[in-house]
Each structure stands twice: as structure tokens, then as C-alpha cells.
From Swiss-Prot:
Protein's UniProt name: Proline--tRNA ligase
GO biological process, one term: prolyl-tRNA aminoacylation
Source domain of life: Bacteria
Subunit organization: Homodimer.
GO molecular function, one term: ATP binding
EC number: 6.1.1.15
Amino acid sequence: MRTSQYLLSTLKETPADAEVISHQLMLRAGMIRKLASGLYTWLPTGLRVLNKVENIVREEMNYAGAIEVSMPVVQPADLWQESGRWEQYGPELLRFVDRGDRPFVLGPTHEEVITDLVRNEISSYKQLPLNFYQIQTKFRDEVRPRFGVMRSREFLMKDAYSFHTTQESLQETYEAMYAAYSRIFSRMGLDFRAVQADTGSIGGNASHEFQVLAQSGEDDIVFSTASDYAANIELAEALAPATGRAAANQPMQLVNTPDARTIAELVEQHGLPIEKTVKTLLVHASEESGHALVALLVRGDHELNEVKAEKLALVASPLTFANEAEIRALVNAGPGSLGPVNLPLPIVADRAVAAMSDFGAGANIDGKHYFGINWERDAALPQIADIRNVIEGDPSPDGKGTLLIKRGIEVGHIFQLGTKYTEALNATVQGEDGRNQLMTMGCYGIGVTRVVAAAIEQNHDERGIIWPDAIAPFQVAILPMNMHKSFRVKEVAERLYDGLRAKGIEVLLDDRKERPGVMFADMELIGIPHTIVIGDRNLDNNEIEYKYRRSGDKLMISVDEIEAFLQAQIAR
């Protein structure tokens, strides 16, 4: 490809509304342009990268035995009503009616459509297992689209759905998809972790996320220093302290704390170590509990894990915190003065709180705290559960090493759905015993557009993008210095361009009448891995300059050897 015949829409300045580096660089490198909030046009450079990501995904899915289909983006509402998600799904589901006043949705996902297809096409256990996938546009009406294509409203996704008659069969496909995903992201040159994850709104049993490590990531991922344990922080187990509870050494005292409405203020004003404080959080209780509110206790330096807490039988789902009026109606004290002593509510204490002694907490009286609280002496030991986020240095749940926490960008997610959708849509097959049985499902997604942004977040410097070779828009850039004034430079550049193309190498020849500085800046911004600089001075020595984008290393290579050299570099 020649730049004179190509849309090279690079920008010198960073657009003001671009928050993260991938969004900034995708705009500056001429990969995307914003059409409306959360909607982007993919320009030629961006589309080349997107197509390469898509091709790797398709190759590995086919290799793993999945079957490609294509399902409509527009879906009839009756399928969503049948599954129950018409009412459950929030405003992210874009609903509309056609000219016949029939309701439809723009598909954010395709569980209903594929389950409907399979229940009509598959009738016997002998036809299973089957794993269908598509690479298709999705639409989610995000309340606040942000970070460019990282969280857009319209995006490209690979979604796969497998159907089985036994859990063993589902497990086999799940493991095959886990392996396929690992190959996909490895081929793309990404530094990623597969982590145990919560199944969330999709539901089901087992679940793993594939997270690309990046400082800008929205997720906290946890992994062990001494094993392959890895989990999303929502799911990572916080073990009980190994030392157990120390003996009581202090009497309980009521202390005036009129200006201490938070743990930080309590610690600062009264010199109490933060690990000797307890936060009391009131949330709405489940109907089965028989109470309006339930108290959750976590140590002052720990954070409540809302995903874990929501799974408690006492807690209403979704988890919602009580407001001040609701709290005062039951306790007659504000949120900053709550504690477990004489609290007339069911209480769940985190494991770390249950192991505390001589601690401080609110007295359920405005402007007062108790110091020196001890379980069983001053307050009954409540229900104990793991309800906090782990922190760095906690012991790994598998007993090997301690935990580290890094930021990650979720690019893939695999689920064992079980019978959630087949039961709702009555998708059955005839089993070996001749009776109808529900199929069990797996679900496997990759955010194709998000992968592009995640790769940039992980691979860039102050000059621009540094693409992994497998997904770079071009493999080689040829920069001929003043080729319009030098016949020799032009001749060598054209010969090299034709030779590389004949070998199947994707090459961009910069034949613009531009200053060398502009040419260098654009190629580094776009992130092409291998750059060839052709100039009269080096040609005097029958040499060409080679530069590797990732390391910045430069070499002088003989004109006669440059094609073979580039082939070897690309094949590495």
C-alpha cells in the first residue's frame, strides 16, 4: 500500500475528550473517528488491525471445533419475554417497535436467539455436543460511554454458545474454549491472565475472565506469588486470620467523638490504629430474613466486597445501602456512629472482624464510639462470612504464597450457564432413555474491538503505538528520503516494495512529499513494527537503515540482503 493511495488521517494534537491512552492514540493514529456518543467509524488503519484480531479469533475457534453462524442484530422482544430478561435487563437494552408496532431489541447478546435456533434444529442427544459462534455487532445503550472503543455502545464481539446433555460434556468444551482463548491472546502478543470470576447477570456455574494487564484497567485482578491461582477481586477469597482472636486486654469505654464521622477521622482524632476499628454498613435485608436492614461489619482498613455480600441469604439482591432516614428509623443514630454493641439488627461480620479484640466502633449514639470492644463479653459473636476485598499481602486461598493485585482489562469471558436459558425457553432433546431432557449450555465471549484498545494500553510509548507483530496494520514501513528528488532512492524503494509484496509481506510505502520528520513521526505513531529508511548517503555504501519499533534498535543492512533480513525478523 502507498500512502498516496491511502487514508492516513494522523493528528498532531490529542483530542480533549480522549481520557485513556488507547482512545488518544487510536484517534491520533487515524484508526477511528467518533460519529456520536459511543459510536465510531473504523478508518483503514484501524480496520486492518480489527480484521487481524478477528482472523486470529476465527482461526482458533475453527481449530477448536466451533461452528460459525451469523445471527441478526435485531431480535424480537417475545424471545426476551420468554427468557424473562425483558423485565430483568436494564436500560442498556435498546427497545423499539417496527411499523407494525411489534417490539424488538438491538441485541446486546444472543443467548435467546441461539437457544431458539437450537431448540428448533436439534432433537436428539446424538446430535450433541455442538458449539456455535459468531463475530457480530452488539449494541448496549451504556449510560456513559467512555474510553473510546473500550466502553462504547456499538462493538464487535465474538460470542459462542455450546449445547450438551451432560455436565462432563460441558466441562470438556469449557476446557477446550479456555485453551483456545489462551492461544488467541498469546498469538496476539498480549500479557494476560485467566482469572476465576463471578458469573454476574448472565448466571451459571463456573466462570473465567481473560484479563489483559494494564494500569488503565477497570478491574482488579488477584494472583499468587507462588502458584497459578488467579481471580477477579470480586471472587478472591479472604482467609480468616491464621492467629485467631487475641485475649481481651481493655475494658469497653464510651468515648465522645463528635467530629469523627468516618473511620479516617476517628483514627486521626483519637489515635486508634485503623486495624483496630470496625466499619458498620447497613444494607437492605432479604424478605426471608424478616428484617428491613442487616448490618455488615468489615475492618476499618478493609473494603466491603459487594458481590460476596449480595450472595448472603440475609441480604437483598441487588445489594443496596440504607439511607440515613432508614437507618435513624431503626437505630436512632447516623451512619457514622454505628456499631455492633446493642444493635437491634441481624449482623454479619467479616472473618477478620470476628478475629478482632479490643476494637473501636460506633456506639449507635450520635457523636459517640465504644473503644475496647470484645466479642462475647460486650457483643454476641454474629454470623461470620467472607465479605471483604482481599488486599496485597493476604495469604493466597490455595495456601501457596501471598497475593498481588494488578489492574486488568477484561477482553474475554467464559461461562458454564447450565440450564438457565434452555429451561426458560424449554429447549430439550430426546435423551438416551427416550425421554426429553433439557440441554445444558456454555457461553464464551471475546470483545474484539476491546482487544484492539487493550493491546494499545499495553503496548505504547511517548511516540505512539507499539503493535505486537501479529496484529499490526502493516508489517513493514518503507521511508524513502526525498524520493521525488532522487532517482536512486526511488528505484531502491520501489524495488524493495515490489519484492516484499511478492513475498506476501504487508508493507506501507510512504511516497508522500513530506519532510522526513513528519514521515518518521507518523510511522512511529501508527506503530508499524519494522521500518526501513532509504537515503542517498547510506546508498553510497549500498546500505539501508532498519529500525525495530519496539526496542528502537537500528541496524545498517546491505541492500542485497534486506528482503531476506526482513523475512527473518518477521518470522521470529
